[in-house]
Amino acid sequence: MSPESRKLLNIIILGIGFMFMFTAFQTSGNVAQTVISSLNSTSFHGSGYTSLAIIYSVFSASNLIAPSIVAVIGCQMSMFLSGLLYSAYIAMFIQPYTWSFYTLSVLIGIAAAVLWTAQGSCLTINSDDTTIGKHSGIFWALLQFSMLFGNLFIYLAWKGEINISDSDRRTVFIALTVISLVGSVLFFLIRTPESDDAQEDDISNSAADAEGTMSAQSCFAKAIDAFKRSLKLSITKEMLLLSILVAYTGLELTFYSGVYGTCIGSMKVFEADAKSLIGLSGIFVGLGEVLGGGLFGLLGKYNYFGRNPVVILGVVVHFLAFYMIYLYMPSDAPIASREGTYLRAFINPSKTIALACSFLLGLGDSCYNTQMLSILGSLYPDNSAPAFAVFKFVQSVSAAVAFFYSNYLLLHWQLLILVIFGFFGTISFFFVEWGLTRRSQYNSM
């Protein structure tokens, strides 16, 4: 097998591994609050929203130490061990306890930072300037399929269920745990790409022997340097402007991945189909993500009009989804009790409207994320690692904040926050894109 084919195979394995892991994890996140509300045990007092807030809070802080962990144990082992912690979190729902629920929420926050740092390193190692776009598109598409498969399983498993029984919960989460473990094991199939220059290995080995005890000091110095560059980059004008939209992506991530499914599941108007609609909603979010990822990721090289039109599409479809949700969904849906809500909004709700909103949420999310990754790569080609570290930090902090307030705010207040950040974030993105375009035109003169 040629080196290029080996690298492509590694990317495919990486994408399939993440697809399995996040099929299990995202499905767990979508149904966590609904499952907890249906628990028969009175000794469990956890909150799915609080758990996800803890995960994203710890994830934010752990981005500072994740590169050091990956440097010490390597990409492959980092992804495998992180995958085991993901599996442990999912397995906890088989027999949940409050202490294990929140303890694993902390551990999986650390695992998430290590996992995504290792993923970025693995993608870079197996790509070059001519293949990074294609490889990123392949990985994105495979990852987004995770939204489809797990939620299809939930839809089929819970169709017709009003309350989730203990046996149904155990069956679902045993299956999800196995799926997550399969994804973790797949990382061991990734092989280090062969060097085009055989002498490079000899030079590297000789250098490693010569450095001896200096290696640890060198790694520490590199970690400190990367941390300093991240701090400097975070206060640049472009990054401060982009941070508004990055924060919005964290807020809307919380909404479509945790809050919206819970709202659907709490609506008594859907009767026996309410719980299974959670899974079907996740499927339609995934369809929107895959469609957007294909159009703006894999076909991005044919985009001659810049990034602004795609971002405009994103804000239009998201605001349309928010308006429809405001019209059909009762305001107490996010914080309804186990019995659900009997309130009505302004129009009669329907499954068609609910699923159409799910699709629009996924499509809009893919618009924002593909263009955000693109503009960061264009702005900071020589500082991509610090740039994406800042991106993940801001996104995860805003997601954590959103999960905290989701426990208390009525739906219309949550939608208002999304609209405000979405509007001003889009405007700030335009300013950065226009500045980048003018700079490119000036350099080409």
UniProtKB/Swiss-Prot annotation:
- Keywords in alphabetical order: Glycoprotein, Membrane, Transmembrane, Transmembrane helix
Q: Which residues cross the membrane?
A: 8-28, 53-73, 74-94, 98-118, 138-158, 170-190, 239-259, 277-297, 309-329, 345-365, 385-405, 415-435
Where does the record place a coiled coil?
Answer: none
Q: CDD domains given for it?
A: MFS_MFSD11
Which of this chain's residues carry glycans?
A: 40, 163
Where in the cell does this protein reside? Membrane
UniProt entry tagged with the keyword Transferase = no
Q: Which GO terms describe its cellular component?
A: membrane
Q: Which InterPro entries does this entry report, sorted A to Z?
A: Ion_channel_UNC-93, MFS_trans_sf, UNC-93-like_regulator
Q: How does it sit in the membrane?
A: Multi-pass membrane protein
What the record says about family reads: Belongs to the unc-93 family.
Which PANTHER family does the protein's record reference?
ET TRANSLATION PRODUCT-RELATED, UNC93-LIKE PROTEIN MFSD11
Quote the protein name from its UniProt record: UNC93-like protein MFSD11
Gene that encodes the chain: mfsd11
